Design a protein with these regions (language model features):
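Bulky hydrophobic segments
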Residues: 1-125, 133, 140-161
Length: 161
């Protein structure tokens, strides 16, 4: 509990948002295969005119693209939230020595990278679902993109001041 006492309320709020988002991601992984396919089907039906306008007419390909974009997107959000949280923790707990700050950021990176690994493991135990190393790679790419975009946004805002 002493760790939490050393963090600001704003940082703790970012931590809560991060935990809620991880819960959302893992909760989504607990949805059975049939329900997950139905959800993807609804999105495909909505986007079908856009797919067809770009020359994509294969329904399986549309579904594949929607599913992989969903993976990427939910992890881009996770990456952005995680970057905000771990950067704040690093600033608040890390000493002035950059090695301490880097250790905090490295711990955050490792913990964030474990989320998609556990996500795909969860899916191994859900009827109609499967875990995939390819999905872990897509998830990690999404998280990295989200972290990069939020870092760039913060950097641009800091330069404006």
């Amino acid at each position: 509990m002493s760790l939490a006492r050393n963090l600001s309320h704003r940082t703790l709020a970012w931590g809560a948002v991060l935990l809620l988002w991880v819960g959302f991601v893992w909760g989504h992984s607990l949805v059975g295969g049939a329900a997950s396919s139905a959800e993807s089907g609804r999105v495909v039906a909505l986007l079908r005119p856009l797919f067809e306008a770009t020359g994509v007419t294969d329904l399986d390909l549309m579904t594949f693209i929607v599913c992989k974009c969903a993976h990427f997107s939910e992890y881009a959000v996770l990456g952005g939230i995680a970057r905000a949280f771990w950067s704040r923790v690093s600033r608040e707990l890390g000493s002035r020595a950059s090695s301490s700050r880097h250790q905090v950021l490295l711990a955050g990176l490792v913990l964030t990278a474990l989320v998609p690994c556990l996500d795909e493991t969860i899916q191994l135990f859900v009827p109609g679902r499967s875990g995939s190393p390819r999905d872990v790679a897509i998830d990690l790419a999404g998280a990295a993109t989200g972290a990069l975009l939020t870092w760039l946004f913060r950097r641009a805002r800091t330069r404006e001041r």
